[in-house]
Amino acid sequence: MQPSTLQALAKRALATQHVSKDDYYILERCGLWWHEAPISIYIDDDNQIMIRTLCFKEGIKLNTALVLAVKENNEDLIMLFTEWGANINYGLLFINNEHTRNLCRKLGAKEELETSEILRFFFETKCKITSSNVILCHELFSNNPFLQNVNMVDLRMIIYWELKDLPTNSMLNEISFSEMLTKYWYGIAVKYNLKEAIQYFCQEYRHFDEWRLICALSFNNVFDLHEICNTTKIHMSINKMMELACMRDNNFLTIYYCFALGANANRAMLISVKNFCIENMFFCMDLGANVIEHSKTLADIYGYSIIVNILSLKIYKANPILLSKETNPEKINTLLKNYYSKNMLAYDICCIDNYL
């Protein structure tokens, strides 16, 4: 969308230019100034305007910048971002005084948003996976009183789906909507190893330390798991940690880390079988797990015939290169980032030989 006035067009053109610090006063006089720093814009790969400031060096979407300006009651930027094409209706989620509401009305805002519009804005805002954007999303959504008054069943379902790999997903039913959103953003930060965001949540929400640990184990983030184990008092047994790591298939990094700290590989294999995590099962045998018959019985009880067939072969043994019990996350990542199970390879070869 093109700016509605020549002045807005000129400001948009200026915001795309490199300006030396000596000329920052020009940007300030033109209203291209926010959080004590200049505003610049760029067009992303989806042809969307992105706003970049000192606080958001990686950029935020134009609509997100608008609602933040509304939250701050920054009238000049509300008008500027609207002229640049931001959807003024989204500002309704963050209005906190009548004067700003009247300004939004003058700029064309309706009286209230539909649930579908709220969900659309939620998706638009959260799609940029950076530390600054995850923190911003938390600040915009987690304690927003407007969301408390809207039927957010659809949003809860979206969050459940995105956190489906977490074994404690069902616990999200037992907490407030605000707390659920906070845990969601914290989980996203851990899942993508966003270090600045993790540090922010760690400092602000010390009572969520166990949630951080659960997310690190479940999302295979060995780097954050190592950080937690070395900086936080953990109130969870190492075998319970291994159990959480085994709930999601292909979690080799966190499974190995728990193994290196002393977790039982046989127990891990049984948990992997129970959860039909076949790659984890093979990896546990690589680590020396040898409860083959017990695992076969368990697989038979659950009706996992493919696992029963796999474990019927007498070809599995530990992989010596995994038995050093390394706890350096960089070395673990190097060892396992392209790892293919030695026992899975043996099974593949056996299947090929039988086929031939």
Curated annotation (Swiss-Prot):
UniProt entry tagged with the keyword Lipoprotein: no
Record-linked Pfam families: ASFV_360
UniProt keyword list: ANK repeat
ANK repeats: 61-93
InterPro entries per UniProt: ASFV_MGF360
Any Gene Ontology biological process: taxis
Family in the record: Belongs to the asfivirus MGF 360 family.
Role noted for this protein: Plays a role in virus cell tropism, and may be required for efficient virus replication in macrophages.
Name of the protein described by the UniProt record: Protein MGF 360-3L
Naturally occurring in which organism (per UniProt): African swine fever virus (strain Badajoz 1971 Vero-adapted)
